[in-house]
Amino acid sequence: PDLALSLVVPKEDGRTAALSSYQLEILRDKNKELNRRLHELSLNAQDNERLIRHIHALSLALLRTRRPDDVVNTLAACLKTDFESESVRVITFAAVYGVEEPWYSHIPADDARLKPFTDCLASNEPICGRLNPEKLPVLFGEAREFAQSIALIPIGGTGLIAVGSRDPHRFYPGMGTLFLRWIGELFEAALAQSRR
C-alpha cells in the first residue's frame, strides 16, 4: 500500500485518467492525515503513561506518610519535582501543624477569602486555565508571574490545591482533568488517614 501511494501516475488525456489521478491524490492526503493523527495519539499515550507513573509514585509516597504535615509536604514536593510544577499552593480548611512554608495556608472553609472559589469548591471538579484576578492574591500572593495558567483542584471538605505556571498554555480550559482529580483524591484520603 505504501508503494502504491508513492507512485506517480502519468497524466493522460481523458476523463478516466483524470479521475484516477484525483482519487490517488485524495488517498495520499487521507494517508498523511491518518499518519499525523496516529503520531499525535502516540505522543498522548506517552504523556499519559508518564503521568500515571508520577501518580503511582505520589501514591506510594503518600502511603509512607504518618502525620498530616508529612502528607502536605510530600504532596507539594511531588508536585514540584515529579510533575515539574513551577508553583504549588495548598490550602486546608483545618489547620495542619508543622507546615511552615509560604506555599501553605490554613483558611477556614467559611472565610471570606474563599468566596471567589465557592463554585469550584461546590462542584468538586478541577478547573484549568486563567483565573479571575480577584482569585490570585489568595492563591499566589505577590508571586503572580506563576499565574499565567493554573490548575485548581478542590479537595472536597478538606481544602484546595493550586498549581501555577508561567506558561499561559500549560493549563487550559477543556484539557482533561482526570489525573488532577486523582491527585486531589489521593491527597484527601492520605490526609484523612494521617489524622486518625
Where do the PLM segments sit?
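Signal-transmission linkers at sensory-effector interfaces
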Residues: R15-A61
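Helix-loop-beta substructure at the N-terminus of cytosolic sensory domains
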Residues: T65-W103
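Regulatory loop-to-helix N-cap segments in sensory/regulatory domains
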Residues: S165-R181, L191-R195
